[in-house]
Swiss-Prot record:
This is Small ribosomal subunit protein uS12. GO terms for molecular function: rRNA binding; structural constituent of ribosome; tRNA binding. Belongs to the universal ribosomal protein uS12 family. GO terms for cellular component: small ribosomal subunit. Disulfide bonds: none annotated. Keywords: Methylation, Ribonucleoprotein, Ribosomal protein, RNA-binding, rRNA-binding, tRNA-binding. Part of the 30S ribosomal subunit. Contacts proteins S8 and S17. May interact with IF1 in the 30S initiation complex. The modification 3-methylthioaspartic acid is found at D89. Pfam families: Ribosom_S12_S23. It comes from Tropheryma whipplei (strain Twist) (Whipple's bacillus).
Length: 124
């Protein structure tokens, strides 16, 4: 525990919170161009081919983003909107593509949780 004199000299340092999505630089989303679209395998107990893309953001940083939902139309040079949000079983993937925005099409035949995948309400 510091003495009063030490507190007078130095004071208390405020705790600095580290951001979980540094490439967005405090913005909710960022636009970027896909430089590579590929699949990866997840960490140990899980098994799948997760769809990911390497994206160069408009602020110059290059990040790996996850493409959520079943099926996608992304390829090299596609322009995508990137949001924060990690994928627990893919190490180093801290961002996701916003479906239904820019070049990323919405998920087809989506009935539930539609807003997350950019799917419009189906007509009766």
């Amino acid at each position: 525990m510091p003495t009063i004199q030490q507190l007078v000299r130095k004071g208390r340092r405020p705790k600095v919170n580290k951001t979980k999505s540094p490439a967005l630089r405090g913005n909710p989303q960022q636009r970027g161009v896909c430089s590579r679209v590929y699949t990866t395998t997840p960490k140990k107990p899980n098994s799948a081919l997760r769809k990911v893309a390497r994206v160069k953001l408009s602020n110059g940083t290059e990040v790996t983003v996850y493409i959520p939902g079943e099926g996608h139309n992304l390829q090299e040079h596609s322009i995508v909107l990137v949001r924060g949000g990690r994928v627990k079983d893919l190490p180093g993937v801290r961002y996701k593509v916003v479906r239904g925005a820019l070049d990323a099409q919405a998920v087809k035949d989506r009935k539930q949780a539609r807003s997350r995948y950019g799917a419009k309400m189906e007509k009766k």
